[in-house]
């Protein structure tokens, strides 16, 4: 399970360095193979390959009404390998789609990661924190 936030800077080739605390898990559970695709909230999702296969099957089984979402998730997916130093290449197309040029935030979201442009994430988080919590949290104890 992945959790926590990491501030990262992509290098000039568009590579991100996976935080050390996640590298061993990714090497052991996914043989350093990852899949990156678009997220509807404007970030990217990064899946260990085994988790991507589960997600891909769920998306592929959706009815025809979801065809455009299938295209967004599956049609934009890119398989990548983490190199020996823990770097992953994020394609120019995916970086552009998420507005990521250099500074980014990697969020562990359980079975996958979200990769955000740092400024976009900070603005979105601040906006959410100003509003009311969703009703699903009404009976949730903190």
UniProtKB/Swiss-Prot annotation:
Its main location: cytoplasm. Residues 5-51, 77-120 form the SpoVT-AbrB domain. InterPro entries: MraZ, MraZ_C, MraZ_dom, MraZ_N, MraZ_sf, SpoVT-AbrB_dom, SpoVT-AbrB_sf. The keyword Transcription regulation applies. Forms oligomers. The keyword Transcription applies. Keywords: Cytoplasm, DNA-binding, Repeat, Transcription, Transcription regulation. GO terms for molecular function: DNA-binding transcription factor activity; transcription cis-regulatory region binding. This is Transcriptional regulator MraZ. GO terms for cellular component: cytoplasm; nucleoid. Belongs to the MraZ family. Pfam families: MraZ (PF02381). It is found in: Cytoplasm, Nucleoid. GO terms for biological process: negative regulation of DNA-templated transcription initiation. Gene3D superfamilies: Transcriptional regulator MraZ domain.
């Amino acid at each position: 399970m992945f959790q926590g936030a990491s501030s990262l800077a992509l290098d000039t080739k568009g590579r991100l360095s996976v935080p050390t605390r996640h590298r061993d898990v990714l090497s052991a559970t996914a043989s350093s193979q990852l899949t990156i695709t678009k997220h509807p909230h404007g970030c990217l999702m990064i899946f260990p390959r085994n988790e991507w296969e589960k997600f891909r099957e769920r998306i592929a089984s959706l009815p025809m009404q979801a065809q455009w979402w299938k295209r967004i998730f599956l049609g934009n997916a890119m398989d990548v390998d983490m190199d020996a130093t823990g770097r992953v290449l994020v394609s120019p197309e995916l970086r552009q789609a998420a507005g990521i040029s250099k500074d980014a935030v990697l969020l562990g979201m359980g079975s996958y990661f979200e990769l955000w442009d740092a400024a976009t994430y900070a603005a979105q988080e601040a906006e959410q924190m100003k509003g009311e919590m969703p009703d699903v949290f009404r009976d949730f104890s903190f």
